[in-house]
Amino acid sequence: MKAFYGILIIFILISMIDLSKQVFINAKCRGSPECLPKCKEAIGKAAGKCMNGKCKCYP
C-alpha cells in the first residue's frame, strides 16, 4: 500500500511539471481552431486551445 501512495505522489508531481509548460497568449478566440495559427506564430508550434476566450498554447 505504501508503494501505491509513493507512485501516486510521483504521478501528481510529474503532471504538475508537465502542465506548467502551457503558455497563455493575449489573443481572443471563440473556438480552438482560431488559436492554431496564433500559437504557431507565438511559440512556433500549432498546438493550443481556446479557454475562456483566450488562447492557451502548448509547446
From Swiss-Prot:
Which keywords does UniProt give here?
A: Disulfide bond, Ion channel impairing toxin, Neurotoxin, Potassium channel impairing toxin, Secreted, Signal, Toxin, Voltage-gated potassium channel impairing toxin
Interaction with Ca(2+)-activated K(+) channels: annotated segments = 48-55
A GO CC annotation recorded here is: extracellular region
Which Gene Ontology molecular function entries are recorded, alphabetically? ion channel inhibitor activity; potassium channel regulator activity; toxin activity
UniProt cross-references to InterPro entries, sorted A to Z: Scorpion_toxin-like_sf, Scorpion_toxinS_K_inh
Tissue and organ distribution: Expressed by the venom gland.
Any additional notes?
Answer: Negative results: inhibits with low efficiency Kv1.5/KCNA5, Kv2.1/KCNB1, Kv7.1/KCNQ1 and ERG/KCNH2. Does not inhibit Kv1.4/KCNA4, Kv3.1/KCNC1, Kv7.2/KCNQ2 and ERG1/Kv11.1/KCNH2.
What family does this belong to? Answer: Belongs to the short scorpion toxin superfamily. Potassium channel inhibitor family. Alpha-KTx 04 subfamily.
Q: Tell me the protein's name.
A: Potassium channel toxin alpha-KTx 4.1
